[in-house]
Amino acid sequence: MAARITNAFTCDVEDYFQVSALAPHFPREQWDSVPCRVERNVDRILALLDGHGARGTFFTLGWLAERYPGLVRRIAAAGHEVASHGYAHQRASDLTPQAFTADIRLAKVILEDITGNAVTGYRAPSFSIGEANLWAHDCIAEVGYRYSSSVYPVRHDHYGIPDAPRFPWRLPNGLVEVPISTVQMLGRNWPAGGGGFFRLLPYALSRWQIARVNAADRRPAIFYFHPWEIDPEQPRVTAATAKTRFRHYINLQHTEARLDRLLSDFSWGRADEVFRDAA
């Protein structure tokens, strides 16, 4: 029998009011006045992982790390990887190279000061590295990150490079890009790595997709989600568009149970360890 493949379990540590789609309703200068729910939700995720003996990677905002350093230390103390999600959840595509570099450097310094460990991984908010700003990979390498997980090789209205490699690749600057998982069907890539699709579609489909990546491609999958996705009690933004409300709030009440099944059905580890020998 073939050995069970260990997949990468990743969590983007941001709160509901920091989501790109809700940015018009929560200006950054007002974030400190908004009730924050991230700590309780991440603690629930840590307990869930511990119950399955699983490890993961937490791509954490520097802004949150400054305000909840104890949470960051708990993540690291439990054996998980603390990686960077930038400082203020600004899309890379909205920044100049100089501003982007400053943002990801600040986040790295904050996280390393809190944990005492090197921070080697980075994920751009909203997978905002696309064909128009591939310069971002050079900035990421320049700051000292070893890998990025910022490209989603799919067609989407807000992100994606549909023809990007489906599996990790090494750039000329030495940086390894670890794209979110997809499956190939009908001549295109389909999302298979979590996020809103994990909530919207039946769990059986996500399970089949990850199993397909493991069995047909013989590769580890990389899965992602956010702490707010297990929090059906979060404040509702009624002023958001119907499309945004649907995408953000659909099936929040079921996500934690689905994660529990996911952790049971597959083997999970940290991205830096799962993809240590990638590319």
Regions found by a protein language model. Name each.
Residues L201-A279:
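C-terminal domain-boundary segment and adjacent tail
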Residues V42-L46, P69-R73, T101-K108, H137, ...:
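Generic structural signal for well-ordered alpha-helices
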